[in-house]
Amino acid sequence: MSRVGKAPIALPKGAEVNVAAGVLSVKGPLGTLSQPIHSLVKVNVENDTLTFAPADESREANALQGTMRALAANMVKGVTTGFERKLNLVGVGYRAQLQGAALKLQLGFSHDVIHEMPEGVKAETPTQTEIIIKGADKQKVGQVAAEVRAYRPPEPYKGKGVRYSDERVILKETKKK
């Protein structure tokens, strides 16, 4: 049995869970998220706890039990506290600002890069060189952060580019004669 899958999920106050027609939906103060449940996994909701069990003894069912439990835990955390990812812009003239719901980036190109935010994801710019991406869906928040970083990833010689706030860029030495 999966060690991750065995652990129950405690539901905090304000989080409601529904299991209907093979879909797990979690509702909370920050919104509603839903995820289809695989047929090899059984879900039980009782007394503010959510538990998962494999439908049979196959190896695939054990693996999917842990996967479903991890996805559900992320959904519960997302609708109650939310997720955020911080990005830093390092480089002369690199700036970010909000333009409505879109993010306008000046990254050394001859044009400004405008990144539209998907449904359920918000961006903040506390300073011109800092971006905070927030949302209830962990996968969407991470995907948007990766897309913004991909416009100008940190280069290995000076470290200029868009990087995660907790990312360490290892700088190379230049060639010497």
Swiss-Prot record:
GO molecular function: rRNA binding; structural constituent of ribosome
Keywords associated with the record: Ribonucleoprotein, Ribosomal protein, RNA-binding, rRNA-binding
GO BP: cytoplasmic translation
This protein's record includes keyword Signal: no
Gene Ontology CC: cytosolic large ribosomal subunit
Function: This protein binds to the 23S rRNA, and is important in its secondary structure. It is located near the subunit interface in the base of the L7/L12 stalk, and near the tRNA binding site of the peptidyltransferase center.
Protein name: Large ribosomal subunit protein uL6
Species, as recorded: Cupriavidus pinatubonensis (strain JMP 134 / LMG 1197)
Lineage start: Bacteria, Pseudomonadati, Pseudomonadota, Betaproteobacteria, Burkholderiales
Name of the gene this protein is made from: rplF
